[in-house]
């Protein structure tokens, strides 16, 4: 399989080197029910959905959990400044997203639009993973990518 991790024209927290490592791991395990904690702007999510769609011939589900820019959510994480101000090094991206679309890439609505090709297979939950996971049936999950809050306690709780 010659699938390569794509960056698209959005912010991503996972560089292509590690994105390709994740794709390799998914290819080895061939999961049907994928959980990602820490969706951010949806770039990794879209790569995962595109790849699972190929290797599982459309027979997969993707569940994503994120705060989706919710400043009111009670958590012990520091919010990176770049999310709040949505600054881009590329001025064209700044114009396109902040002025033309007026869209926060980290919002639930934006990520849903970005994953619209897979909307029947994608389940997105807004909130703190420590709370959301308690209300999900995770028995079928056969692969989890944990990249949400990076504090020790949050990561430990997500596991």
Feature locations, PLM:
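S-adenosylmethionine/decaboxylated-SAM
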Residues: 3-159
């Amino acid at each position: 399989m010659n699938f390569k991790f794509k960056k698209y024209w959005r912010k991503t927290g996972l560089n292509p080197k590690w994105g390709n490592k994740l794709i390799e791991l998914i290819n080895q395990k061939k999961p049907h029910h994928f959980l990602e904690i820490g969706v951010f702007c949806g770039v990794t999510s879209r790569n995962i959905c595109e790849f699972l769609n190929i290797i599982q011939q459309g027979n997969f589900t993707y569940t994503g959990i994120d705060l989706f820019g919710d400043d009111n959510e009670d958590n012990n994480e520091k919010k990176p400044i770049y999310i709040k101000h949505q600054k881009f090094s590329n001025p064209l991206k700044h114009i396109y997203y902040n002025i033309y679309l007026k869209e926060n890439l980290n919002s639930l609505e934006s990520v849903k639009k970005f994953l619209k090709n897979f909307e029947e297979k994608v389940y997105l939950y807004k909130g703190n993973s420590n709370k959301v996971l308690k209300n999900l049936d995770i028995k079928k999950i056969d692969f989890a990518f944990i990249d949400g809050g990076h504090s020790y306690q949050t990561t430990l709780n997500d596991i």
